[in-house]
Amino acid sequence: MAAAAATAVGPGAGSAGVAGPGGAGPCATVSVFPGARLLTIGDANGEIQRHAEQQALRLEVRAGPDAAGIALYSHEDVCVFKCSVSRETECSRVGRQSFIITLGCNSVLIQFATPHDFCSFYNILKTCRGHTLERSVFSERTEESSAVQYFQFYGYLSQQQNMMQDYVRTGTYQRAILQNHTDFKDKIVLDVGCGSGILSFFAAQAGARKIYAVEASTMAQHAEVLVKSNNLTDRIVVIPGKVEEVSLPEQVDIIISEPMGYMLFNERMLESYLHAKKYLKPSGNMFPTIGDVHLAPFTDEQLYMEQFTKANFWYQPSFHGVDLSALRGAAVDEYFRQPVVDTFDIRILMAKSVKYTVNFLEAKEGDLHRIEIPFKFHMLHSGLVHGLAFWFDVAFIGSIMTVWLSTAPTEPLTHWYQVRCLFQSPLFAKAGDTLSGTCLLIANKRQSYDISIVAQVDQTGSKSSNLLDLKNPFFRYTGTTPSPPPGSHYTSPSENMWNTGSTYNLSSGVAVAGMPTAYDLSSVIAGGSSVGHNNLIPLANTGIVNHTHSRMGSIMSTGIVQGSSGAQGGGGSSSAHYAVNNQFTMGGPAISMASPMSIPTNTMHYGS
């Protein structure tokens, strides 16, 4: 059934028909498609009648919240057809670049100049009609309230700025794309969840011929403004909508995206990233290409007691005369269900991390609905295990080199930080013991995961477990330097301070005996509080690094160190490590940590 009346008008006639109920208002967004052709088909008298406009027309679509107003104009700006298309309108796509609308006993076939024009028109129409004819994969897996909040959040320029100012993130993406320019030169690119469009601009810098930038939030409008102001409208096409619901006019050579959340999987955008492979050519690539989740046991009595102390508020027998103690158990459960988002000194880790890898080129969406990570840790230290720490690395495996982006605690801090999941009952383990178990992540419709962790010390049989809600983390990061664990000093710090000073030229800060050049002991003598130590662990082959002091809560930019002697690679391969500020300083025994995955090609480790 037609939603509104429409009239086809012969050449030279004035406009006819009006937008029906629910039609687009005067403030709606207008999209223009030149070169359209119109064919009217009817059988009012029992015979098929056809009328085709001989000249190309200009089609205008005025998008509204519930319907789209469509009008076609001749070169003389005479309206030859006008109607409103809502969710009740009978309509369908025809072939690769045509669309048919049935109004009463007449049908109107609109042919667009290019398949790209048709896809843009079709995406606008689907958005206006509310997608009620079929539910997309995204809609099936996501609660509406969660989706609304999610896209509203990413529609703010301030949030885009927060991500763009994570210079490790942004700089690594740009370096990965530009250093692998042959993967982009004259290629077709799909940017999934483009946000401000920054990755699309990087692809354009690398020489991409066409970039389709898909964005479901209102940020798409801002991205379109940036595309126009940077004179890239001929190469970057912003497509408003979800990648599960829009249409692309052609297959692409490479997909780029920044789909990672806390613990890699939070927000479930990785599934949209994998869904986009329906547009990827068989020989196509994806940036990022693989993702590694690392987990390791940690000890942190201070964090553990913080959570219990908060819950002890409910242990009061007389709070303004009310006994709250009956809720203390529920409060403990609630606080310990929260994953803790912050950073930490790497020396709290008690074993080498276990790695779980997702190859985005091979993985399917369903693989991320239930993620089971078995682990077996060989304990390097004795003490209480308070939980598991998580971080991730992603690799951009290009034709020229592989670039890594890491959120490891040894690396410069990013807006992903690290995540820790506590046990309600800590486990005691000795050096040489094995801690085994499973971390199970079950996807939920709130665009997140329910986490179940079960761990056991094999030698004693002692076991602990916890259930956590990744959608409701505790943001603990304060911008201050994380403290090393108690008992980390194996010589006198006071003596070391003065002994170290004797090896320095205090006026110039010249390094002696391999100490970092930027360490100025005069700051210690003046008060010591300005010396920034973060994630204190000496790593082999890191080279001399500039150590800068950052403001509280800031995301730091990178320094550069070339030619690490510990570079890996085959014969003739090159390796560059873009090292960072105050992440690597001296102190404490090293803990063996899993390094980024070795790829048999030229590799680069930028800002990570």
From Swiss-Prot:
Result, substituting S217E: Loss of S-adenosyl-L-methionine binding. Loss of protein methyltransferase activity. Localized in the cytosol
Tissue/organ expression: Ubiquitously expressed. Within the brain, present in proliferating cells from lateral ventricular zone and dentate gyrus (at protein level).
The GO molecular function terms of this record are: histone H3R17 methyltransferase activity; histone H3R2 methyltransferase activity; histone H3R26 methyltransferase activity; histone methyltransferase activity; protein methyltransferase activity; protein-arginine N-methyltransferase activity; protein-arginine omega-N asymmetric methyltransferase activity; transcription cis-regulatory region binding
Which reaction(s) does its UniProt entry say it catalyses?
L-arginyl-[protein] + 2 S-adenosyl-L-methionine = N(omega),N(omega)-dimethyl-L-arginyl-[protein] + 2 S-adenosyl-L-homocysteine + 2 H(+)
EC number(s) for this protein? 2.1.1.319
For the keyword Transcription regulation, the answer is yes
Location of the region described as Interaction with C9orf72 in the Swiss-Prot/TrEMBL record? 28-139
The protein in question is named Histone-arginine methyltransferase CARM1
Where, per UniProt, does this protein localize?
Nucleus; Cytoplasm; Chromosome
Species source reads: Mus musculus (Mouse)
